[in-house]
Every structure is written in structure tokens, then in C-alpha cells.
């Protein structure tokens, strides 16, 4: 009856294709337009819009093998044969088409005729009130009554709050008496390993209302799920999912890397199983564009990687190793998931970087945790403070469940409430900081608006408008007018001025009345739907109730619009070239330039930068219309508009659509046609934080100015080098480099001669202390390289020499001491000597027994410092003799 995992998967999908089902590939682990889920955790999860009637399915019968991640039982992974965070779910689904009869009879047909499982070892459960299912199992399938178990709501009725729900039927396999607990009561539902549930058929036939009343659905649905790993274990006759063919290959690779043999040590086996499970989930998550972070699904990934890394250390693997398993995982899954092959190197890099980062802090964190656990044990306490757990999380990158797991191994529990409190406080601080950065710059102004006033923004359609002054604030107080020279905040009933928001800076321009003119310096969103114009009155006065002409600086706005639309093109290009993980982390759009932060784990290559620039410029040259669509949020998401993960949107949103190249939710201002951007040029690419890169770029006339400046610089270089053409510049530079290298070698020779000459003088003036020669070099110089060279030459020439440099540099003294290992054996300790000598100089110093350095500010004590060194060295040699 043996069947490989790949064979089972393919036979299942082919079987349901033969029953009129459309085979769909596995969906991404990242839920699409479903904020209720962090990660896809069931076969039906990506199909929810079809079940809920929000979207029309491509066919009313669908079959899939869906990759899934579940982490609620992460603490149990490795300790049991069944628990895993990553798994594949086989499923067949009906959206108002067939129902119980087909679902049950086809399931039985597949299990008995395709998998050929012995009928006498199969059992089923049904919901206790589901007589329809009983009749089908008993009369249609022919299963004897004793093998059909009626179970209660807790076991055999699927529902989540209100909405679609229904009874379910589960199929079990009897693994035999020898796998049971031996109790007379052993049967379906027993916690032992004898009866294994492997297929759940859910009959969604009711709609539960808020009063708890069940109404029959007009078009009932079918949702089934069979765990691939679980059925593979049955078909391959093994006791654990870690023993099935594709998982065993990964497990064996881990054993090879760590040098551990599976099955010889129960504690090591747990660690091997943890790594085996977590590396599978990790590979698929990174492959789907998730990057490690401290939030959301990125945090789930970080937990898996760091937990696996810690278990690697428990197996004696202290260096990074997880990336070495990636090829084996891809080899195991390349048939159903060929996309992993091209993503292999990328997955390895992300894994290596994350594990390396954790390795930098894990030892310090483990020491802190172990010391705290020892203290608790000594005091006969068993609760680790939330403050310690939070410090491990915040400072050393320990996910909470990792701390909890390590503590539990020692019989210690973690103060979850204390940890949660500190986490909430940190989130609140971050939320307040973000809030201050967003729309409420007015809070720094300390103004209060009592009346119901509102500013209508008309700046999408026009750059100038007639308006009326509603309020004026000066020095945080409401005033009736502002005179020449005053800086004030003006609220209008309508304005074309864009207020700083979403990374785009505010417009600038002028406000004009019959009696005055004000220059608009900044614009912010204020309270109660107002827009605050920070303005300086440059002529006459501006008064409340004045009719006013508001005029935006056209050139600055146009430059900003070019940069903002270019930012969208850049974002889309990054995701196309680097991968879907390269999502926006922050941005700044201003007239002079644009700045874009995005998720990525390594610097961009020169080739990637050129490719990104070319892609953006190609779209610019195509002069594609830029559509601005106002719609509700749900409609925008259904259109496929990109929404920033952490951004909060109102119900009515603006979609910026650029052909089929880019579509994002955005409230900023944009050009009407990509051709208006002119040109796009990346001027820098750098790191902002771990896993976040930054691109700065320019557009339009700024690119032309950039090119002119570069031409001028190039011309100056050509003239300086006396090159006849630009192409000769590199050759001239190569010649200069060769000449400099030759001169540096010549200089090094002269420096060595000078050092050797000085060394001879110093050696002759040195003190003989026992068998050792103490050479004291007192001089004034800034050439520290020269001093180090002299020191090295002393040690090269004479193993019995001890050298002490006392160097005067401006108003400070530098101490550098070195000796041979032979001198160390005789009692010399440069570290201790330099420490004492530096105290004489009013400073600090130290180092190794054979090399140390330090300094101080009391340069007048250099002679005393030399005398102190002689005393210490004499004492050490004489004491060691």
C-alpha cells in the first residue's frame, strides 16, 4: 500500500479533476485582502471570498493542495509525532454545486479504490443530529452502523461565531491494537495514537444569525481538508510525519550537518524535529515574499528561524547552518512548487542574514536568562519577571515563546502579564510618536478650535482658488488679523494647498487679499478637518472674513507631483525586479528629490540599479495616463490596489492607477501622464536599518542639472589628468595608481631604513634588566603607524626585547607597549604595566600580556611614567626568575 507523498498529492488532484473540479495551484501564504488572517492556515482560507459570495469562483468545483502555516501549538512541535507549523492540505470544494452525497461517496472512492486503504480499518464520525450523513455512509457507501460514530457539536460541527456553518464528518484510520493505549475504552476520540483522523468533510448548510438561530442556506457548500503529511504517514506505514519520505530527507540532512544520529538521544531528537519542521515553513514563507521583522507575519518567520537556530546550538551547531538545508527542502518540494528553485539563493541569503544577526546577541541573551533562572532557583522562585522577558525580546531578539520554552525546560514560568504590559507601553509610545509624525503637527502649535469649522481641499483639481479666511492664530492665540512681519496659522474655508501627509511635503505659495499678501511656508492637517496654513505676512495685513486668493507655487507642485508618481513607478519596479518582499517602509516626496525606503536584506548591485532605472524610464517614455480613481476601500482592494500594511485608510480612498504597471492607494498629488516626469535617476542606495534599504532619486529638470554637473566634473578631471578624451580618463587613472603604488613601496623602504636607524640608537640607549633589554621610545609625533612599525621591528629583531613607547601628541600622551611570549613567560604583563603607567598620566589603558595601549592628559608626567614602567618591569622579571 506504500505511496510516496508526491504520488498521493498528484493522485488526489487528478481524482477530483476527473470529477469536474478545477485544479488551482497553492495560493501564497500571505492572505489576499483578508485582514482577519496573518497567514494562510487552512485549505479553504484563500477561498473565503467564494464561500462568502463576495467573489465569483472560476468554477463551482475546485480542488487544491494548499501550503499552510499554523503556530498556536509551536511549543509542542518536536515533542510529538503529529504537531507541525508547516503542512499541506488537500481539499475539494463545492460552491453551491454538489453536496453531502457526492462529498461522502467520492471521499470513500478515493480512500478505498485509489489509496486502497483496507475498508475494515476505516471508521467515520458524524454530527449526532446529521441523519442525512448517516444514511449516506450506511446505505450509499455500505459502511456498517457500528463504524459510524455520532459525536457532539464540539467535535463534529464547524462554526465561527455567526455566519455560514454546518456539521462535518471525519474519516479515521485504525493503526492497530499495538498502537493503542490498551484501555478497554480505547476507540474513536481516544488520545492515543491508534485511531488517526485524516480527512474532514465540512457540510456548510446553515447560516447562524446573531440570536443563535440556524437558517438553511439556499446554496450549501462543501469544504474538505485532508492533511497530506498525515495520510502519507498512513500510506508509508510510519509513526511520525517526520518519517515520511519528503520530510525524512530534510531530517537526514540536518543530522548530516550537525553530526547527530536520529533516534539515539530523545532530547536531541526533539531539536532535530524542531529544525526539520521550522526550516520547511521558513523556506516557503521567504519564498512567498515574507521577511523577518518584529511585526505581523514577519515576526512569525523570525520566531521560526530563531527557534530553529537555538535548537541548532543545542545540537552543538554554533555557527550559521540553516541556509545549508535550503537546497534539500527545495529538492523535496520542487515537483509541486517549482517556483522555489529560482528563489533558492534569495531564500539562503535571507536565512543567513537573520541567523547571523541572532548569533550576535544569542550568547549574551542566554547568559542573562540562565543567570536569572539560577537566581530564581536559588531563591526557590519559579516566575521569570516580565521585565526580563521583555529585555530579551527588545534588546537581544528573543521571541517570547523562545524565552518561555527555555524557562520551561528549567521548571520556570514567564510573567506573561508583565511582558504584555511592557509590550503595550512600547506600542503606545510608538503609536503616539507615529501620530505626532502624521497628521497632527498642529498639536505642537497648542491651538484650540471651539467652533465647527472645516477646510475643503480642492488642490487635486486646481492650484488657485478664491477663498475666505475663517480663523487666524498667532503665538497659539486666536486673533482677528495678522500684520506685516507676523508668522501665523491661517484657516480657510477651501484651499488648493496640499497639507503634508503620506510622505509628501506641503505645498508653498501665496495668499492675497485686497489689503495684504502672505507667503505660505508650510501646511498641516489640523483638528476637526481643518487645514492650517503657516504663513508670513509680507505686505499689509490679513484679517478674518477677508476674501482671499490662494495660489500654490506651480513649479514646486509640479516637481513634487513628478517625484510622487515616480515613487509609485519605483515601488512597482522594485517588486518586479527584487521580489514581492520589496514593499514600502517609508517615503519622502519633495520638489528636489524623492526618498524611498523598502524591505530588502542586502545592498543592490550596480546591475540591479541600472535595471530599476531602465524599467522606470521605460514607463515614463511610454507616456501612460495616470488615472485617479475615488472609490470605497473594499472596491479598491478588489481592484487589486496595493495598500501599505501599516497604513490606516478611511472608507473612501483614492487609487492611483498607471496602466497595468502600478495601482496603489494614495492621497498624494500626481502628474496626469508618466511622460510629464521626463527622466528618472537614482543618485544613492544605502542601508537605513536591518532589512531596510533606501533609494534617493531625482526626476525632470533635476536629472538634467545632475547630468550637466557630472559633465562639468568629468571635464575638470579630464583637464587635470591631461586626457584627450573621456575614454582616456580611466587609462590615466590606472597610470596614476601604478605610480602611487610604486612610490608607496619606495616610501616603505625608506621608512624601514629610518626605523632601523632609530632602533639602533634606542637599542644602545636601552636598559638591560636580567636577560631582557628594555627599550623606551619617548618622542613627539602624530605618525602612529610609524610607532607600530618600530614596535614590530623590535620584536622581530630580538625576542629578548621589551619596547615601551611614550608618545607626546599635542596635549595628550599615548602609551604603547609590546614584548615577546618569552618575556610573558618570565612574568611580564603589558596590560597591567600600561594600566599603571596610564594612571600616572591621568588616564586609562590595558590590553593583553604581550601587547597593550592607553593614554592620558598629564604629559608633564612622561618621565615619571617611564620611571614607573622601569620599576614594574624590574619587579616582574626579578619576581619571575
Swiss-Prot record:
Its main location: cytoplasm. NCBIfam families: alaS. The gene is alaS. It catalyses: tRNA(Ala) + L-alanine + ATP = L-alanyl-tRNA(Ala) + AMP + diphosphate. This is Alanine--tRNA ligase. Keywords: Aminoacyl-tRNA synthetase, ATP-binding, Cytoplasm, Ligase, Metal-binding, Nucleotide-binding, Protein biosynthesis, RNA-binding, tRNA-binding, Zinc. Catalyzes the attachment of alanine to tRNA(Ala) in a two-step reaction: alanine is first activated by ATP to form Ala-AMP and then transferred to the acceptor end of tRNA(Ala). Also edits incorrectly charged Ser-tRNA(Ala) and Gly-tRNA(Ala) via its editing domain. It comes from Caldicellulosiruptor saccharolyticus (strain ATCC 43494 / DSM 8903 / Tp8T 6331). SMART domains: tRNA_SAD.
Amino acid at each position: 500500500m506504500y505511496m510516496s507523498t508526491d504520488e498521493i498529492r498528484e493522485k488526489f488532484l487528478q481524482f477530483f479533476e476527473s470529477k469536474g473540479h478545477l485544479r488551482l495551484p497553492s495560493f501564497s501564504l500571505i492572505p489576499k485582502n483578508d485582514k482577519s488572517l496573518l497567514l494562510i492556515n487552512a485549505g479553504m482560507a484563500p477561498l473565503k471570498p467564494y464561500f462568502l459570495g463576495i467573489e465569483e469562483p472560476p468554477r463551482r468545483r475546485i480542488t487544491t493542495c494548499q501550503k499552510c502555516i499554523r503556530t498556536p501549538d509551536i511549543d509542542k512541535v518536536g515533542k510529538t509525532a503529529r504537531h507541525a507549523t508547516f503542512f499541506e492540505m488537500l481539499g475539494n470544494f463545492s460552491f453551491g454545486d454538489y453536496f453531502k452525497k457526492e462529498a461522502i461517496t467520492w471521499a470513500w472512492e478515493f480512500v478505498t479504490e485509489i489509496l486502497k486503504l483496507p475498508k475494515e480499518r476505516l471508521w467515520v464520525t458524524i454530527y449526532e443530529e446529521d441523519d442525512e450523513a448517516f444514511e449516506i455512509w450506511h446505505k450509499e457507501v455500505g459502511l456498517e452502523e457500528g463504524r459510524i460514530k455520532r459525536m457532539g457539536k464540539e467535535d463534529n460541527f464547524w462554526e465561527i461565531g455567526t455566519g455560514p456553518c454546518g456539521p462535518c464528518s471525519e474519516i479515521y484510520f485504525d493503526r492497530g491494537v499495538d498502537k493503542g493505549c490498551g484501555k478497554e475504552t480505547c476507540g474513536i476520540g481516544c488520545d492515543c495514537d491508534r485511531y488517526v483522523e485524516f480527512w474532514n468533510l465540512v457540510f456548510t448548510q446553515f447560516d447562524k444569525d446573531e440570536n443563535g438561530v440556524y437558517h438553511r442556506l439556499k446554496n450549501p457548500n462543501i469544504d474538505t481538508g485532508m492533511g497530506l503529511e498525515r495520510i502519507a504517514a498512513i500510506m508509508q506505514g510510519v509513526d511520525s510525519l517526520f518519517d515520511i519520505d519528503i520530510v525524512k530527507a530534510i531530517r537526514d540532512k540536518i543530522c548530516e550537518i550537525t553530526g547527530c544520529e536520529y533516534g539515539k538521544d530523545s532530547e536531541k531528537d526533539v531539536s532535530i524535529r524542531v529544525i526539520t519542521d521550522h526550516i520547511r515553513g521558513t523556506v516557503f514563507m521567504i519564498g512567498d515574499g515574507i521577511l523577518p521583522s518584529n511585526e505581523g507575519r514577519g515576526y512569525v518567520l523570525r520566531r521560526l528561524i530563531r527557534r530553529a537556530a537555538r535548537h541548532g546550538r543545542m545540537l552543538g551547531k554554533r555557527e550559521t547552518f540553516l541556509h545549508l538545508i535550503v537546497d534539500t527542502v527545495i529538492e523535496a518540494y520542487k515537483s509541486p512548487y517549482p517556483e522555489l528553485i529560482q528563489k533558492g539563493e534569495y531564500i539562503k541569503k535571507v536565512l543567513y542574514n537573520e541567523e547571523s544577526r541572532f548569533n550576535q546577541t544569542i550568547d549574551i541573551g542566554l547568559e542573562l536568562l540562565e543567570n536569572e533562572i539560577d537566581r530564581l532557583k536559588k531563591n526557590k522562585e519559579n516566575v521569570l519577571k516580565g521585565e526580563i522577558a521583555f529585555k530579551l525580546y527588545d534588546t537581544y531578539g528573543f521571541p517570547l515563546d523562545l524565552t518561555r520554552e527555555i524557562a520551561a525546560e528549567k521548571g520556570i514560568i514567564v510573567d506573561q502579564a508583565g511582558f504584555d504590559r511592557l509590550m503595550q507601553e512600547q506600542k503606545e509610545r510608538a503609536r503616539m510618536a507615529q501620530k505626532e509624525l502624521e497628521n497632527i503637527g498642529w498639536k505642537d502649535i497648542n491651538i484650540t478650535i471651539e467652533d465647527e469649522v472645516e477646510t475643503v481641499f480642492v488642490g487635486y483639481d486646481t492650484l488657485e482658488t478664491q477663498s475666505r479666511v475663517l480663523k487666524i492664530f498667532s503665538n497659539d492665540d486666536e486673533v482677528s488679523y495678522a500684520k506685516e512681519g507676523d508668522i501665523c496659522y491661517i484657516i480657510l474655508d477651501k484651499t488648493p494647498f496640499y497639507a503634508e501627509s503620506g510622505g509628501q511635503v506641503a505645498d508653498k505659495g501665496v495668499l492675497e487679499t485686497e489689503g495684504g499678501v502672505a507667503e505660505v511656508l508650510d501646511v498641516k492637517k489640523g483638528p476637526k478637518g481643518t487645514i492650517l496654513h503657516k504663513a508670513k505676512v509680507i505686505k499689509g495685513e490679513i484679517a478674518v472674513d477677508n476674501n482671499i486668493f490662494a495660489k500654490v507655487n506651480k513649479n514646486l507642485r509640479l516637481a513634487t507631483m513628478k517625484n510622487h508618481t515616480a515613487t509609485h513607478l519605483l515601488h512597482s519596479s522594485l517588486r518586479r525586479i527584487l521580489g514581492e518582499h520589496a514593499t514600502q517602509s517609508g517615503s519622502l516626496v519633495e520638489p528636489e528629490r524623492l526618498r524611498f525606503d523598502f524591505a530588502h536584506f542586502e545592498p543592490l548591485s550596480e546591475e540591479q540599479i541600472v535595471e530599476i532605472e531602465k524599467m522606470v524610464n521605460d514607463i515614463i517614455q511610454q507616456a501612460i495616463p495616470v488615472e485617479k480613481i475615488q472609490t470605497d476601500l473594499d472596491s479598491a482592494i478588489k481592484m487589486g490596489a496595493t495598500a501599505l500594511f501599516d497604513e490606516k485608510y478611511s472608507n473612501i480612498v483614492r487609487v492611483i492607477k498607471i496602466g497595468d504597471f502600478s495601482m496603489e492607494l494614495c492621497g498624494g498629488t500626481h502628474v496626469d501622464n508618466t511622460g510629464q516626469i521626463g527622466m528618472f535617476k537614482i543618485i544613492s542606495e544605502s542601508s537605513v536599518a536591518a532589512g531596510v534599504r533606501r533609494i534617493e532619486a531625482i526626476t525632470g529638470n533635476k536629472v538634467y542639472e545632475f547630468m550637466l554637473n557630472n559633465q562639468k566634473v568629468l571635464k575638470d578631471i579630464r583637464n587635470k589628468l591631461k586626457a584627450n578624451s573621456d575614454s582616456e580618463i580611466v587609462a590615466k587613472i590606472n597610470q596614476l595608481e601604478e605610480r602611487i603604488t610604486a612610490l608607496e613601496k619606495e616610501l616603505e623602504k625608506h621608512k624601514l631604513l629610518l626605523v632601523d636607524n632609530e632602533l639602533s640608537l634606542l637599542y644602545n640607549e636601552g636598559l638591560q634588566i636580567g636577560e631582557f633589554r628594555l627599550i623606551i621610545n619617548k618622542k613627539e609625533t602624530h605618525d602612529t603607524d610609524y610607532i607600530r612599525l618600530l614596535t614590530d621591528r623590535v620584536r622581530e629583531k630580538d625576542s629578548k626585547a621589551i619596547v615601551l613607547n611614550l608618545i607626546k601628541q599635542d596635549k595628550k600622551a599615548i602609551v604603547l607597549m609590546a614584548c615577546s611570549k618569552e618575556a610573558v613567560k618570565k612574568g611580564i604583563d603589558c596590560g597591567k604595566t600600561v594600566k599603571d603607567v596610564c594612571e600616572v598620566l591621568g588616564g586609562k589603558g590595558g590590553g593583553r600580556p604581550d601587547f597593550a595601549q592607553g593614554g592620558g592628559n598629564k604629559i608633564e608626567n612622561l618621565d615619571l611614567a617611564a620611571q614607573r614602567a622601569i620599576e614594574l618591569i624590574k619587579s616582574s622579571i626579578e619576581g619571575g626568575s
